[in-house]
Amino acid sequence: MKIWVDADAAPVAIKEILYKLADKRKVETIFVANRVLKLPRSQHLHFRLVAAGADVADGEIVRLLKKGDLVITADIPLASLVVEKGGTALNPRGELYTKENIAERLSSRDFMQELRDGGVETGGAPPFSAKDKQRFANAIDRILARLR
């Protein structure tokens, strides 16, 4: 099992949790981004640089993903592809995407996009909080215990 991180938009606090977790759990963790990231030295941490462009990192993650891998992403279309391919998708706020909830999440995302495209101001996600960080840490611990 590997952990893939859609790293371009991942909060720093989540990356820091993943750095520690990779060594503690001895799980290969690959950060995929279209700009260079400095990672701590570790045999368990890896970085893949992809070309700039919409969904390039997503495509690389889906291409390399194996059934049973875990993907950290806030990108709902990417999460949908991960679930479809037999992977597990977790967002940085600790929400697990599943076969049971991904269609609803995609539908809601698409609806909000239609509103924005129509000029409606929908606001954004609330700022990333300490509670979000804790929810993520708890969720990834549960997932890794189940997957390993």
UniProtKB/Swiss-Prot annotation:
Pfam families according to UniProt: DUF188
Protein name (record): UPF0178 protein DP1304
NCBIfam families from the UniProt entry: PRK00124.1
Cited HAMAP family: UPF0178 (MF_00489)
InterPro entries: UPF0178
Similarity-based family: Belongs to the UPF0178 family.
